[in-house]
Regions:
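Gly/Ser/Thr-rich phosphate-binding loops and adjoining beta-strand/alpha-helix segments
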Residues: 3-6, 24-43, 92, 106-127, ...
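Short amphipathic alpha-helical signal-transduction/dimerization elements
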Residues: 52, 145-153, 242-246, 280
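Active-site-proximal acidic secondary-structure segment that organizes catalysis
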Residues: 4-6, 10, 117-163
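Helical lid/core segments from catalytic subdomains that handle acyl or acyl-like groups
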Residues: 191, 275-303
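Amphipathic alpha-helical regulatory segments at dimerization interfaces
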Residues: 46-54, 98-102, 132, 225, ...
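Short amphipathic alpha-helices and their capping loops
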Residues: 1-22, 45-90, 108-110, 151, ...
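Extended, hydrophobic beta-loop-alpha segments that form or line the acyl/peptidyl-thioester binding
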Residues: 55, 59, 134-149, 252-259, ...
Length: 303
């Protein structure tokens, strides 16, 4: 008999949004990984299958229990196929362009898929994972840079100290504690009567409403400022965002939501899954404060 686990709050938010917009692909995390020309594709396929078999989170199936609550478990009997293709460069480009498609979170198909492609000039791995089973740490780090490389080189895969399923049970239990109730009361009072800022994005695309990105920021002056004032670069950028938002809203005090990685438990460092948390932020852009003091204030806000 399979054991059902609750969804993390981080997963639940993704689940609800996807149920509201089932045709959206904004929560698809897809990548095209160009492989070295001398790579052995048969060996790469074996390595890929080894990783897939080893990581239960990739086998996650979501279902509704008798009370209509979403629950998850690892369906190790459901095959996650690895596609193998030899095609022209033009065919490969068309294949990649059409690769991303909506997932049915309650359906029969796996929530990830993988394809190895070989053309006359390129070798590549194309893969897509739904955000409900993966985050940036998993998608960009643990899977391609650690597990896949180790498996290809014949090295053992690092074991997961704790699975997301176990952490989800712990999170559900914490919601019943006095500490959780006190934290909920703290945030309710802190943001009571405060309207959260809302920025209009660009025209809707396949990824939803997006904001145009620019590459004008240079890393060197940011690092120099942070070293001089003993602040973290992510907090400097968070403070800059808060200040810009304050100016756009024409309010000294501005509230908005941001994200944190959610892997505060060290036993989750090697764990596959979606741990990114949405957190509320309240910034006071006091014009009398220095930049360094404002960044320090933001750091305290995030603790």
């Amino acid at each position: 008999m399979k054991t059902l686990y609750p969804l993390l709050q981080a997963q639940l938010g993704v689940f609800l949004e996807c149920q509201a917009e089932p045709e959206s692909t904004r929560y698809n995390l897809a990548a095209r990984l160009l492989l070295p020309a001398d790579i052995d594709m048969e060996r790469m396929e074996q390595a890929l299958r080894q990783v897939i078999d080893a990581r239960k989170m990739l086998h996650t199936r979501i279902m509704l229990d008798e009370e209509g609550r979403p629950r998850q478990y690892a369906d190790m009997d459901r095959e996650i196929p690895v596609g193998k293709h030899k095609m022209t460069d033009e065919e490969a480009d068309a294949f990649v362009d059409a690769y991303v498609r909506p997932y049915d979170l309650l359906g029969e198909e796996p929530l990830c898929h993988f394809d190895l492609i070989e053309t006359p000039t390129r070798k590549m791995l194309v893969y897509d994972m739904h955000h409900i089973i993966t985050d940036g740490t998993t998608f960009l780090g643990l899977f391609p840079k650690q597990d896949l490389e180790n498996a290809y080189q014949g090295k053992p895969l690092e074991p997961e100290q704790k699975l997301l399923y176990d952490y989800a049970v712990e999170e559900a239990q914490k919601k019943e504690t006095p500490a959780y109730a006190a934290a909920a009361d703290y945030y309710q009072k802190k943001f009571e009567g405060i309207e959260f800022a809302d920025l209009a994005g660009s025209k809707p695309t396949r990824m939803g409403n997006t904001i145009i990105l620019h590459d004008e920021l240079k890393a060197s002056p940011i690092k120099a400022f942070c070293e001089k004032n003993q602040v973290k670069d992510n907090m400097l950028l968070q403070a800059a965002y808060s200040l810009v938002l304050s100016r756009l809203c024409r309010q000294q005090q501005v509230a908005y939501t941001s994200v944190r990685h959610g892997r505060f438990d060290k036993s989750l460092c090697q764990t596959y899954g979606m741990f990114v948390m949405t957190v509320p932020v309240l910034a006071d852009a006091n014009p009398n404060m220095s930049v360094a003091d404002f960044v320090s204030r933001m750091t305290e806000e995030w603790k």
